[in-house]
């Protein structure tokens, strides 16, 4: 192998490692993070904090329990470093659903979940309630997964 070819191969390999590092750097998930979206102009409650590492390691939650595709199919095979869309990218309306007025038809589940806050609440609260029931059944003690506004939104309502 010529010296030029050798230098080219080594340079290509080194550059590939740098490119991989740059691509993966922005896709690692933090251990905990606030469930915030810049799309919200105003908030009624302080942002909830997700303890991602705790959910995965302690509670053994798999990816598909929270993450799903556009058809609601669980994404169970997410790998570390993969880009994952934020909820707001599909659940595009940055608010809770409007209060139903007398005579108006009830929203379908699909229509309701277009509202970002409704989709998040469905995802988190349903799972937390199931978890708490399981703990109660197995131990006789109340489960600690939060299901009320003030437990998930520290400080509660924004004044």
What are the roles of these predicted feature ranges?
Residues 2-6, 21-159:
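Short sequence/structural segments immediately N-terminal
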Residues 10-20:
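Bacterial N-terminal signal peptides
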């Amino acid at each position: 192998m010529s010296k030029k070819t050798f230098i080219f191969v080594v340079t290509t390999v080194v550059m590939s490692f740098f490119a991989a590092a740059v691509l993966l750097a922005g896709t690692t998930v933090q251990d905990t993070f606030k469930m915030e979206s810049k799309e919200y102009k105003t908030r009624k409650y302080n942002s909830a904090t997700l303890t991602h590492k705790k959910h995965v390691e302690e509670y053994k939650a798999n990816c598909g329990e929270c993450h799903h595709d556009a058809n609601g199919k669980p994404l169970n095979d997410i790998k570390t470093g993969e880009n994952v869309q934020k909820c707001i990218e599909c659940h595009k309306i940055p608010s809770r659903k409007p209060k139903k007025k007398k005579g108006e038809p009830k929203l379908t589940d699909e229509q309701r979940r277009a509202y970002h806050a409704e989709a998040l609440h469905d995802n988190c609260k349903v799972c937390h309630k199931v978890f708490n029931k399981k703990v109660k059944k197995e131990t006789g003690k109340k489960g600690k997964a939060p299901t009320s506004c003030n437990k998930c939104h520290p400080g509660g309502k924004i004044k």
